Curated annotation (Swiss-Prot):
Gene that encodes it: traH
Repeat keyword on record: no
Role summary: 2-oxoglutarate-dependent dioxygenase; part of the tra gene cluster that produces terrestric acid. The clavatol biosynthesis cluster cla and the terrestric acid cluster tra are both involved in the production of peniphenones and penilactones. The non-reducing PKS claF is responsible for the formation of clavatol from successive condensations of 3 malonyl-CoA units, presumably with a simple acetyl-CoA starter unit, and 2 methylation steps. The esterase claE probably collaborates with claF by catalyzing the hydrolysis of ACP-bound acyl intermediates to free the ACP from stalled intermediates.
Molecular function via GO: dioxygenase activity; metal ion binding
Official protein name in the record: 2-oxoglutarate-dependent dioxygenase traH
GO BP terms: small molecule biosynthetic process
Superkingdom as given in the UniProt entry: Eukaryota
Annotated 2-oxoglutarate binding sites: R280
SUPFAM superfamilies listed in its UniProt record: Clavaminate synthase-like
UniProt xrefs under InterPro entries: DIOX_N (IPR026992), IPNS-like_FE2OG_OXY (IPR044861), IPNS-like_sf (IPR027443), Iron_ascorbate_oxido_reductase (IPR050231), Oxoglu/Fe-dep_dioxygenase_dom (IPR005123)
Positions that bind Fe cation: H211, D213, H270
Amino acid sequence: MSVDAAVVKNEDKYIPTIDLRDYFDAYSEEKRAKVIEQVRKACLEHGFFQVEGHGVPVESQRRMFAACKALFDLPLEKKRRISLYKYSWRRGYEGPGEQQANDPHHGDFERDAKEGFFVGKELPLDQVDFGKGPNVWPPDLAENDFHRPVMEYYEHARKVGFKVMELLAVSLGHPPSILKDFTTDAAMFLKLLRYPAHTWTDTRKFGSGQHTDYGGITILLQDPGQDGLEVWHEATQQWVELPALEDKFVINLGDMVQRWTGGKYKSTLHRVINKTGGERYAVPAFWHGDLDAKNPLDPNDTSDETVLEFIKKKFYKGYGLTDDTSL
């Protein structure tokens, strides 16, 4: 893999678009079988595909981006008051340079230029653990401008996660019922992102450095027209640009799914280079399933590592955290 390898446009040639309606709304077994095969092929080759027909209203997507812009337009000192470093369950604001998405074995790169903000399922303080607890809401934003549109979108994205997880299971030859316990109390972390314009000359610095996602399924919403996501295509040794299109989500598999499938399904390198000349917004939803589960896709796996243990280890590494880290 080379940071300077050629960059090509996707045009559905490398990373396919799959219509979820052909599986979930179809009465044709032929259509359902075709979707299952499309998912299987994409996961075997590079672990990335795009989806349409997902059921998330366009208006909810647009309100989500309006909320993003309202948040990140706040003065930096106000955003830092709700820093994720202040809360052991790690909700809230991430400033520029606070995360290094890139793992050192992928190369020597600077920390990410982006800003972020984590949201999750609302839980009371007496249930606090890593990834579990109350959300942290910016006090300067009205509920209708931020809290409500964000949580409305959160619930929509969570439902997409259930659909994609079912497709992964059936594409591996399992019945959907294998996920019954895994999806009962499924965890998902939503992350609002803002990337600055890529105006620097340092070749080791990116909006988000090349990395693989470490968890389960990522459901990425991109602000239409704000391109920047590039996916490494191993077979052709080049970067593939995935355009930001309205009402089309990018799905990719994380390291946890790759481990669960014994390396059969791929977790693939990707990066963000914001060439728009302005700010770029995106909202990934990291859908992990039951945090106390082990391997829902292989009942014969004898590993004792839980979802929570796996993602906590990876998260802490990216942010330079320990259980005691705080500002």
